[in-house]
């Protein structure tokens, strides 16, 4: 089964980055939140917008327009477990180019879909582009609210913040050992790797610069409690965009600690001559355990990576990997999503976009099974999919995956088996 949320804004690019659906209206169904960060106001200002749709009916529950000129409000839209105390999920929306004191420092705002009101607002004052990436961090201060890791990668070196989910205040700031740039471009929550009982984090800097100015690309694993560097990796070929995407992976080497996926999708390869790569590193030792390459140069393989559940029945969570610029025949940037066994590396299935230039697989997130059967589901974005004759609108498709032992004998669901859409 699949369901579709279609954008409505011409060139709005619905779903640049979105989080796992959560129930915001109390009907027992997980609802979908996403933004169209390029929505125009006053003809030229890319203020952006964000909205929440019912997971049951597809009806729009709440929508907001960005209020900061050119701020890209809706660049990230993250559903978060109850922040306001009303028992319902709320949303955090990023406007990473929102002006503060005349600079594009960025603003993060938490809002209630139930009332539409602002719960808190945090404006960056030190670095720039606050909210370029963010992820749920768990409850680090014991106040019963989910906190957030938030990247602000621009400025001299970039920063990552641990923000209090209740009021948006800063609990901790993470900075790199050296000011090499773009630290915080991507952040990922990991398991507890240093044994202190708290979830740790991975940070990417795909446009870090060496002393001679050359792009290198870096990734770190940090202790969330102390900020101590646990692991560090880099890539000398700056074309690869190493560290542009990170993800937690199941334990593959048997040491009881989860691993880390670091992508090198080739985002800085303007000629599109190199294939993207995904590398899996040990969370315990930092040693490289796996390395997979895309099927063609320039497809942005591993532009998105997410755990997809155990699809092959081997007891290890497998991966969904996006390649949004995949060429299918003569159609460019159709996009594809690859389902790959984390243990064996075997490709279990592939899905493809509808047409040229729809960028299928740009962003992917896990989702609850809308049918309540406990099967893994994925929400997949086609960032530039046309809608009703309008270009670069964007759509989100929800797919329910069938494991290898489903009662009906069918394997992993494919895109061709879509049965219903939400418009």
Positions of predicted regions on the chain:
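Surface-exposed coil/turn segments at beta-strand junctions on protein surfaces, enriched
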Residues: 9, 25, 68, 84, ...
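Blade-edge motifs of beta-propeller repeat domains
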Residues: 1-13, 32, 47-72, 91, ...
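Short glycine/acidic-enriched loop and turn motifs that connect beta-strands
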Residues: 38-43, 97-101, 154-157, 207-212, ...
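Flexible loop residues that form catalytic
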Residues: 37-38, 82, 96-97, 139, ...
